[in-house]
Regions:
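Non-catalytic, mobile gating and regulatory segments of ester bond hydrolases
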Residues: 2-317, 321-495
Length: 495
């Protein structure tokens, strides 16, 4: 299969894992004969011959990945429906003062029914941790003074605990609907609410997906996260080409569509022309721009705000998938040579972020985010499984970069290059993981007494801790752990 070729002769290379292309029998064949036809059925690659050896070296990881994605594909809709029912039930209990209040309201015929999209309908993430206020600065000044960086300055400088708290709370708030976000930003945070954008994104793969797209002189990037930013579609690998070249503009994307009247994302040439005009005029985020995908929507709005506020800087942040998109956003800005915007970037904070690319990608971004002054911090809590995915091994070569701020279950911060147990594998880690999950459950019952009512965990959060006894890496991914780490964290004295 030919690679996607650029005008200067360089090639885009890619590997797409397609679990839907084979059945269970093919999965078995992939396990037994990793270099056979059964294995090749699942892979679309620009250099298939080279990848055969890599599949053979890590066959069990490949097989488990394919099986998990097949299960997710089968159970996707039922899980979505179940999630909606659970979320509605939790909101029903919340707006009626929990179970006893709901029973009383049923007797009185005065049941409050939650409605999606309103300021009282909270996401599951928000129900796990109900805190809305930002960190109290007076409480911050009473205790710890060492945090993240030795830099000190006025206002929200990198390394300031208030800034990190704002980032982690913004990451939590991003799971909510527009009305909830607007209410919290205006009433609790006393800040200006810019807007809420429901960007169109194609289906993105899970962290168990090992598909990648390689940009010459930049490195390999996880395809699922590129899709989530709206920068391509694995159904047509050529679609990434137009978005990932230097000086990419929406006009150039339109000109690349030589057949028919639609772009690789289903947008008409006339629509793209209107979007391009809006970008050139720094106008506003129209519905057409919002639909075009997250990257262009955010870049347009950010450019407009930076023009209005000449001395302003901005921070990019996110949790889990949002963390992956947070670090890829400045990466694509650099690729597109948006140096004026990059010059206004204060930093990037991610929480529980999965790996987004290979070692070369990290080396490409180091001059912009790591050296000479670190501006990219990955916050990792204890046994959180997500930062350990996709696996970092010799077959797939996914690597983290930037400064890792690792917090153990005592909320002690360690500044490291890589979190311990980087692939969440190994018998020697298994028993400590389960013991730690038990400690976290016990800790959750005591937090309200040891640290004050602000840190008291509700029944739903404690239930998640109980589930964590069976799946410790999943419960550790909760934002409650990250908020507590930011607010209670103390710097390790041994490092």
């Amino acid at each position: 299969m030919a690679t996607t070729q650029l005008k200067n002769g360089d090639d885009f290379r890619y590997l797409v894992v397609r679990p839907e292309k084979g059945g269970i029998r093919d999965v078995f064949r992939c396990w037994v004969w990793p270099d056979g036809d059964g294995a090749r059925r699942f892979f679309e690659s620009s250099d298939e011959g080279v990848f055969d050896a890599k599949v053979s070296e890590s066959r069990w990881i490949v097989v488990v990945s394919i099986l998990i994605r097949k299960i997710i594909a089968i159970l996707g809709k039922p899980l979505e429906w179940t999630g909606n029912v659970v979320e509605f039930t939790l909101n029903l209990l919340s707006v009626n003062a929990n179970l006893l209040g709901l029973l009383c309201n049923i007797v009185r015929g005065d049941v409050v029914v939650p409605r999606r999209g309103t300021e009282t309908f909270i996401s599951t993430v928000g129900l796990l941790d109900g805190r809305m206020d930002l960190l109290n600065e007076e409480k911050m000044l009473q205790g710890t003074t060492n945090f993240v960086s030795e830099e000190r300055g006025l206002g929200l400088e990198m390394g300031n605990r208030n800034l990190v708290d704002l980032c982690v709370m913004a990451s939590k708030l991003s799971y909510e609907n527009e009305k909830v976000i607007q209410n919290i930003v205006l009433r609790y945070w006393k800040m200006h609410f810019v807007g809420f954008y429901n960007c169109w994104n194609d289906d993105w793969s899970t962290d168990f997906d090992y598909s990648w797209y390689e940009i010459p002189e930049v490195g390999k990037i996880h395809i699922g996260f590129l899709e989530a930013l709206g920068l391509g579609n694995r159904k047509d690998t050529n679609s990434f080409n137009g978005h990932l070249q230097a000086k990419t503009s929406i006009s150039s994307i339109a000109s690349d569509v030589s057949h028919g009247s639609t772009s690789p994302f289903g947008h008409t040439k006339s629509t793209i022309s209107k979007i391009d005009q809006n970008i050139e005029q720094f106008d506003e985020v129209t519905p057409e721009v919002e639909q075009l995908t997250a990257y262009y929507t955010v870049k347009l709005q950010l450019r407009r705000l930076l023009m209005e506020h000449k001395n302003a800087k901005f921070v990019v942040t996110g949790h889990s998938l949002g963390g992956a998109l947070a670090i890829l956003f400045p990466t694509v800005l650099v690729l597109h040579e948006e140096m004026e915007i990059m010059g206004r970037l204060l930093g990037v904070y991610t929480f529980g972020q999965p790996r987004v690319g290979n070692k070369q990608l990290g080396q490409f971004m180091e001059p912009y985010l790591v050296n000479p002054i670190p501006r990219y911090f990955r916050v990792v809590y204890c046994n959180d499984i997500v930062p350990r995915l996709p696996y970092d091994n010799k077959a797939f070569l996914f690597k983290h970069f930037g400064v890792c701020l690792y917090y153990d279950s005592l909320f002690t911060e360690h500044k490291v290059d890589e979190e311990p147990n980087k692939n969440f594998l190994g018998i020697r880690y298994l028993i400590p993981e389960y013991l730690n999950a038990f400690w976290e459950l016990l800790r959750s019952l005591l937090m309200g007494y040891t640290h004050g009512p602000e840190y008291k965990e509700g029944w739903f959060c404690i239930l998640a801790r109980v589930i964590g006894l069976a799946f410790p890496g999943i419960s550790a991914h909760s934002l409650t752990n990250y908020i507590d780490s930011v607010r209670l964290g103390k710097k390790s004295q041994s490092l």
